[in-house]
Amino acid sequence: MADLLLGVNIDHIATLRNARGTIYPDPVQAAFIAEQAGADGITVHLREDRRHITDRDVRILRQTIQTRMNLEMAVTDEMVDIACDIKPHFCCLVPEKRQEVTTEGGLDVAGQVDKMTLVVGRLADVGILVSLFIDADFRQIDAAVAAGAPYIEIHTGAYADASTVLERQAELMRIAKAATYAAGKGLKVNAGHGLTYHNVQPIAALPEMHELNIGHAIIGQAVMTGLATAVTDMKVLMREARR
């Protein structure tokens, strides 16, 4: 089974910084520490309201990240312009609502295939690999293929939020079937949202998974153990799940 990659989302380093309007903690320093600890990539979400990561952060990170930069962003003209200028290695297109605390669901690709095709094409034209953040739904997977995206990221929020063992098993099965279906269509399959040290291994064990993007749990654990240890511990769990 291929190695499973870990993308560390550092948005909440910026959340902590912005809570006091200071210049620390610095997302750039956090990215460096995460990479040194084994992160395979760094993910940041430049939201329309700039509530955590800022344009300046994105530009500096693009110049300093030594692995791969994954820019999460809404499907807007402004964000596409920024991405085409900065040229991160990856862009993950996500739905976005200003009032939400965090991304609440997957992107409705099936309802806007023409628009998504144009955006995917525009990003691809400048060398950016595009991922679509979608629910574990065959219809959305088919739409991602139609739009020309090489990657999808399966939204694992319902799995993470399941309140019973039976609910979690049902969500895991749904994700597993979607991952198999997507891989059969030629897509690279990533996953993320709500993954923690306690629930990551069943997702990590799915053979089709290429990369997991994890942020809040790692940054939360970093408060207790330090960022390097938090990243390393997550990598260990992911490796164990693949044995």
UniProtKB/Swiss-Prot annotation:
The record marks E153 as: Transition state stabilizer. One of its GO terms (cellular component) is cytosol. It holds the Pfam family PdxJ. 3-amino-2-oxopropyl phosphate binds at N9, R20, G194, G215, H216. It catalyses: 3-amino-2-oxopropyl phosphate + 1-deoxy-D-xylulose 5-phosphate = pyridoxine 5'-phosphate + phosphate + 2 H2O + H(+). Pathway: Cofactor biosynthesis; pyridoxine 5'-phosphate biosynthesis; pyridoxine 5'-phosphate from D-erythrose 4-phosphate: step 5/5. GO terms for biological process: pyridoxine biosynthetic process. 1-deoxy-D-xylulose 5-phosphate binds at D11, H12, R47, H52, T102. The active site is at H45 (proton acceptor), E72 (proton acceptor), H193 (proton donor). The keyword Transcription does not apply. Keywords: Cytoplasm, Pyridoxine biosynthesis, Transferase. GO terms for molecular function: pyridoxine 5'-phosphate synthase activity. Signal peptide: none annotated. NCBIfam families: pdxJ, PRK05265.1-1, PRK05265.1-2, PRK05265.1-3, PRK05265.1-5. Catalyzes the complicated ring closure reaction between the two acyclic compounds 1-deoxy-D-xylulose-5-phosphate (DXP) and 3-amino-2-oxopropyl phosphate (1-amino-acetone-3-phosphate or AAP) to form pyridoxine 5'-phosphate (PNP) and inorganic phosphate. Belongs to the PNP synthase family. Homooctamer; tetramer of dimers. PANTHER family: PYRIDOXINE 5'-PHOSPHATE SYNTHASE. This is Pyridoxine 5'-phosphate synthase. It comes from Yersinia pseudotuberculosis serotype I (strain IP32953). The gene is pdxJ.
